[in-house]
A protein has these predicted regions:
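Soluble FAD-dependent oxygen oxidases
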Residues: 2-537
Length: 537
């Protein structure tokens, strides 16, 4: 996500939390609590003691680790409890033990890789729970002879890009723009980035996986079966088990690529260009991806306008890009001076918002430093937004101010893959996907500010309803949004799940529920937007 720090205040990672830890209040609870911790060493590899990986609220580093990989500070305001423990797994058996013992002693398990869940479901719950933190399981094993790699769940997108670049300057992988995303969760919801039109989603290039099921078994593609392998690619893995690692197929990229950013304000014809972009961007050759990103700006007093950025990535050199743009989108007026040529791995820095010339070593920074209060929502568009609709969008942006919108074109490879190929169903027929995000600072207040900004995000979402997909109004699971429907922390009502399930997974929801019934019939793996087992008839 490329966000200007001049627009949104930066706040410290450390904040004062008004939530309390869940500690046993009677003897029965205390027995369960103690039994859980005594269970863990018995179920894990003794050569790598799990006791060294367990943090409780009594540990001095507990609060630091809890917050370190919790990237949306808003979620703490609504949290009623902290976890009874954090298991910072250092060996696959630690994750297996967490499943077996949490299940045996009736603790809910939340799985966290990078901590980028927009609603914080990977590290909050309203019932006694344990966080299984996968961050230390971050190995990346690349085999250039087969152009494949095994990537553990705790590795970040930045680490993956860096390790590929160590081996080759003509290989890459299609996944997120943000470089601190945990691979485990990012891939499980689909995983997309600026290679989406050329190579599809991350999951479209996954060829195997290791999954821990509700019985603590480690399964691969063959042993889990094709139905489960289908479900974990785009269906949100934490409904089905715990991803240990993904096996991916690397993709080919040229030695040099070209990136650009062209900005136009409303006074410079941005509305006409945005209208034209909708018609052009989804139909461009696969090698070219152009994101449209409008943001409100204030030139002083009441002199507000909207500046629209056209951010492009081309798998080729500048001369070829200019020839293509002169034919397909001459209205943008792209010039040679707008273009920057660089290696593919350097282009990942460009998209992440690092300054030109930054060392690729920044890709190894695994934790997002600047935390924010935020609320995000998503939409899919199957028809061009009329100019009147764009003007509505501009007006709401100027009214709200602290908000950003990203419009990402589809077409290309996404048109070619069936919506039944994986659990990810948003394929052909979509022109673009949109992220709406609003952010605010700690200085603006706590609960009251949160309520106000969340309501503003809903105002924008409602304003765009006439133009977005409908029946259902589709949403992207990696842009988690509890507004579209949810369950309680410890319950998964099927009728409630159908509401958000249809929006996230369209017609694939029922098949996902059927798979859930087979691999996790007692619904051990659950959260507020998980997939329930399909009821038996």
């Amino acid at each position: 996500m490329k966000i200007s720090s001049s627009i949104f205040p930066i706040i410290s990672i450390f904040i004062l939390l008004s939530i309390s830890s869940v500690t046993p209040s009677d003897s029965d609870d205390s027995d369960d609590f103690d039994d859980f911790f005594q269970c863990l060493p018995k179920q894990s590899d003794s050569s790598i003691p799990i006791t060294d990986a367990i943090l409780t609220p009594n540990n001095s580093s507990f609060q630091y680790i809890y917050q370190l990989r919790a990237n949306n500070l808003r979620t703490f305001l609504s949290a009623t409890s902290r976890p009874v423990a954090i298991i910072t797994a250092r060996h696959p058996s630690h994750a297996q033990a967490a499943v077996i013992c949490a299940k045996r002693h009736d603790f809910q398990l939340r799985i966290r890789s990078g901590g980028h869940d927009y609603e914080g479901l990977s590290y909050t719950s309203d019932v006694p729970f344990v966080i299984l933190d996968m961050f230390n399981l971050n190995s990346i094993d690349i085999d250039m002879s087969t152009e494949t790699a095994w990537v553990q769940a705790g590795a970040t997108t930045g680490e993956l890009y860096y390790r590929i670049a160590e081996k080759s300057n003509v290989h890459g992988f299609p996944s997120g723009v943000c470089t601190t995303l945990g691979i485990g969760g990012h891939f499980s919801g689909g995983g997309y980035g600026f290679l989406i039109r050329k190579y599809g989603l991350s999951i479209d290039n996954v060829i195997d996986a290791q999954l821990i099921d509700a019985n603590g078994r480690i399964l691969n593609r063959k042993s889990m079966g094709e139905d489960v392998f289908w479900a974990i690619r785009g269906g949100g893995t934490t409904s089905f088990g715990i991803i240990l690692s993904w096996r991916i197929k690397l993709v080919r990229v040229p030695p040099r690529v070209t990136v650009f950013t062209v900005q136009r304000t409303l006074e410079q014809g941005a509305t006409e260009l945005a209208y034209r972009w909708q018609q052009v961007a989804p139909k461009l050759p696969k090698d070219l991806f152009i994101r449209l990103q409008p943001e409100p700006i204030n030139n002083g007093g009441n002199n507000k306008t909207v500046r629209v950025s056209f951010i492009g990535h081309f798998l080729g050199q500048a001369d070829g890009l200019l020839r293509l743009m002169n034919v397909s989108f001459p209205e943008l007026g792209l010039t040679r001076n707008d273009c920057l040529q660089m290696s593919w791995v350097e282009s990942t820095l460009y998209w992440a918002g690092f300054s030109n010339g930054s060392s690729i070593d920044v890709l190894l920074d695994r934790v997002a430093v600047n935390k924010v209060f935020a609320k995000e929502k998503s939409d899919y568009y199957k028809a061009v937004i009329p100019k009147q609709g764009l003007e509505t969008l501009w007006q709401v942006l100027m009214d709200i101010e602290n908000i950003f919108v990203q419009m990402n074109p589809y077409g290309g490879r996404m048109e070619e893959i069936s919506d039944l190929e994986t659990a990810f169903a948003h394929r052909a027929g979509n022109l673009f996907k949109v992220l709406y995000g609003i952010q605010w600072s700690e200085s603006e207040g706590g609960v009251n500010a949160t309520a106000r900004y969340v309501e503003l995000s809903r105002r924008l979402y409602n304003a765009m309803a006439p133009y977005a997909s409908s029946n259902p109004r589709e949403a992207f699971i990696n842009y988690r949004d509890l507004d579209i429907g949810s369950n309680e922390s410890d319950e998964t009502d099927f009728e409630d799940a159908k509401e958000y399930g249809a929006k996230y997974f369209r017609n694939n929801f029922i098949r996902l529920a059927d798979v859930k019934a087979k691999i996790d019939p007692k619904n051990f793996f659950k959260n507020e937007q998980s997939i329930p087992p399909l009821p038996s008839h």
